[in-house]
Amino acid sequence: MFLPQEIIRKKRDGHALSDEEIRSFINGVRDNSVSEGQIAALAMAIWFRDITLPERVALTMAMRDSGSVLCWKGLDLNGPVVDKHSTGGVGDVTSLMLGPMVAACGGYVPMISGRGLGHTGGTLDKLEAIPGFDIFPSDDRFREIIKQVGIAIVGQTRSLAPADKRFYATRDITATVDSIPLIAASILGKKLAEGLDALVMDVKVGSGALMPTLEQSEALAQAIFGVANGAGCKTTVLLTDMNQPLASSAGNALEVREAVQFLTGEYRNPRLLEVTMALCREMLLSGGLAQSDAEAQAKLQAVLDNGAAAEAFARMVAAQQGPADFIERIDSYLPAPMLSKAVYATTSGIVSTMDTRALGMAVVALGGGRRRASDSIDYSVGLSHLVQPGDKVDGERPLAVIHAASEASWQQAAQAVQHAVMVGQQQPASTAVIYRRISQ
């Protein structure tokens, strides 16, 4: 039996904690024998003192084991169980295409996703723009959908890493959210509970990212890579750009529409295509579904071209209680905004830079996101037809189309977009979409 205060004292004084001490503390978080004050104290001690890689692995495994861990062995799946996780951003709709694409290539993707909070969008919120879509199927139904369709996207249940929920809630109010080892443990505690054969992490970099600077993002990427592989899950990490929205739209129903356009071939934003393909290739390679980049690329292009990826998305929607003809009748199912109108730059010129976080907060202000976890969402609002750095803007070419619930909210969003998009007279330097790959 380890006393929580002695564990806190040990870390406060800069000593390494044993696996048993870490597991004892996290078990106490789960069963409420450890108080909120004690969680806050340990989190702050970790923030100041950091923890070693073995401690990080032990913390992550304890978070994972605080609840149920999915096991797929009894289902006789004829392919690998793989997933992707992104640190989040604006217009990051990759999950909605990536899951069906990998499933169409023979993988199984049990994606447990989250809601949006702050300026970042949430995959669950996007899917709830689809009428009837059930993000909380029973465990048996979840397993059944994975077996039959190959892809299901669901929310975190109470049985999944429950200690992390309590630990994170305390971090959120004690200025310890930005602790890299605690971020890694929180992300991976949930992901490893999925029972994965392989994981691909997308760590965002830039003005719309969790960690704005490349240095911070690389530190987080290295932490996630070390912990996940140390915990026995084959993991690759990509660092990708979030200095502008990833898609051409930002907002729940708007991003669902763009995902369907991507899968059917109607429209594919080049940056979104590059990141989605790169993540999918890593999933195929990590899962043994392809032996080279070229083979993975060919398989992915084939399932886009022959409609298999779009079909997998349609089957997932139907299996999770959404409309069976959603793709064919998308206009009749997605909610329509009260007002859609373009916003223009105050001066003509060339888009130089974008404050991606500010664009995300403009969507939140429209009603498309949450400031607090209890807030409700207007799924119809957001931004579409977004410009990119290097685009010319004038009285003919708008910065974006704003979809709003009222003229007043449109006006507020228009000002926010005009302030967030900087216009100059020279072409900006081209920047990478994918900065770095970290793998074994």
UniProtKB/Swiss-Prot annotation:
It catalyses: thymidine + phosphate = 2-deoxy-alpha-D-ribose 1-phosphate + thymine. GO terms for molecular function: 1,4-alpha-oligoglucan phosphorylase activity; thymidine phosphorylase activity. Pathway: Pyrimidine metabolism; dTMP biosynthesis via salvage pathway; dTMP from thymine: step 1/2. One of its GO terms (biological process) is thymidine metabolic process. Coiled coil: none annotated. InterPro entries: Glycosyl_Trfase_fam3 (IPR000312), Glycosyl_Trfase_fam3_N_dom (IPR017459), Glycosyl_Trfase_fam3_N_dom_sf (IPR036320), Nuc_phospho_transferase (IPR035902), PYNP-like_C_sf (IPR036566), PYNP_C (IPR013102), Pyrmidine_PPas_bac/euk (IPR018090), Pyrmidine_PPase_CS (IPR017872). Disulfide bonds: none annotated. GO terms for cellular component: cytosol. It comes from the Bacteria. Its EC number is 2.4.2.4. Transmembrane segments: none annotated. It is an enzyme of class 2 (transferase). Keywords: Glycosyltransferase, Transferase. NCBIfam families: PRK05820.1 (NF004490), T_phosphoryl (TIGR02643), Y_phosphoryl (TIGR02644). Homodimer. The enzymes which catalyze the reversible phosphorolysis of pyrimidine nucleosides are involved in the degradation of these compounds and in their utilization as carbon and energy sources, or in the rescue of pyrimidine bases for nucleotide synthesis. This is Thymidine phosphorylase.
